[in-house]
């Protein structure tokens, strides 16, 4: 098992350096520079512009800039935002709990609906229920996040007035941050009104962000269950007189979840990329909205640091998924 973990962990190193290359060079393909953006419409004196480029090291050749950047990254220094002059890591850690809270709620939404829906579709194969679940899953998978988000806002916020449009909590509540997760912090402060406000603000973003993973998980669960339900040991269990519920719950589900666990790990990356659009639509003060604003400002350190930190997080989650996969399926960890 240790060898299996070490092998998976060693793959992170080249992936990490690949991410630094992408984060550094792709950003510089965007026209303009952050100094011009910082100056705004009033413009900036050419001499002052050249001096600021030198101060931020942007006057050096790109490869030299990358060498300086990677050296600082290896020391844990992601630089400072050109716009706010705050350390990138500090800004990221301040906003990250909001993104995690949204991503966790979206994943729970996807799991609690997607897995049961996939199981029911497999058990009721070729029935109206099966076709309905797969049809809805295909629709959810194909639906653009920005369109789905605007549609839900128009229906539930504008027309019906059931849910808030934007933000994490109503402006009339102030919660002292303890964990950074408003649902938890509002419970710790024993403020029920703040808790329900935070929960209501989560409803639409959770649905929008969780729809795509829900569709993928439902389809994968159905496919895995259908494959397992056709195995000989399942037919043997049924021949012994076990009820359909016991066959599915005790024998089929555990083996069917093996490929589903892998898909769940892959959906973590989908959640964080989807969070960029979702947070923008709902003005959710998280890392995704922060990165979108940094793109408009050409804030290189923020973009590089944010992309790198999110990439490391996704790699860490995928490593945990691989380890979990090896625990569930011993054949995987013994493969050379």
Region spans (language model):
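Hydrophobic alpha-helical transmembrane segments of membrane transport/permease proteins
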Residues: 15-67, 156-194
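N-terminal signal-anchor/signal peptide hydrophobic helix marking the start
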Residues: 6-12, 16
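Alpha-helical transmembrane segments of integral membrane proteins
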Residues: 2-4, 96-129, 145, 158, ...
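Residue-level signal for discrete positions within transmembrane alpha-helices
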Residues: 12, 95, 99, 135-142, ...
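An internal, D/E-rich "acidic patch" concept
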Residues: 59-115
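Hydrophobic alpha-helical membrane-insertion segments
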Residues: 16-21, 140-161, 263, 267
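Hydrophobic alpha-helical segments of integral membrane proteins
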Residues: 9, 52, 62-78, 88, ...
